[in-house]
Design a protein with these regions (language model features):
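Active-site beta3 strand of CheY-like receiver
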Residues: 48-54, 59
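C-terminal output helix
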Residues: 16, 110-120
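The feature encodes the CheY-like receiver
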Residues: 60, 78, 90
Length: 128
């Protein structure tokens, strides 16, 4: 495994989904941070500069789309890949997420293999 594991920020307000994503990612050797609050997600991204952000679209207070737009608007976070992970499954939801600055879109319930393929397309698990 890599000496310096990649860090993934999970922005999700559903505790069951957080636990599932965290377990899958940590089982694959990634470090995780998590929050269910949009403003805290922005602050964590600025303070920790994760290698990838998994963004729920439907958050309390501030939507994941707004969080994504704010992260894209700041030099400290604009290059961090962001993957929308959401129960919204209509085609226009995906377009809206991508237009807001997300790099990819994964629908819930997730397929573990498809989810990991998406994550690993942005973050190789092992360093060469």
């Amino acid at each position: 495994m890599a000496d310096n594991p990649k860090r993934i920020l999970i922005v999700e307000d559903n505790e069951i989904d957080v636990r599932l994503l965290k377990d899958i990612l940590e089982m694959r050797g990634y470090d995780t941070l998590q929050t269910g609050d949009g403003l805290e997600a922005i602050n964590l991204a600025f303070a920790n500069v994760p290698d990838l952000i998994l963004m729920d679209i439907q958050l309390p207070e501030m939507s994941g789309l707004e969080v994504t737009r704010r992260l894209r608007g700041d030099e400290r976070s604009r290059r961090i890949p962001i993957v929308a992970v959401t129960a919204f499954a209509m085609g226009w939801h995906e377009r809206e997420a991508l237009d807001s600055g997300c790099d990819a879109y994964v629908s819930k319930p997730i397929s573990m293999l498809g989810f990991l393929r998406t994550v690993e397309s942005f973050l190789p698990r092992f360093s060469n």
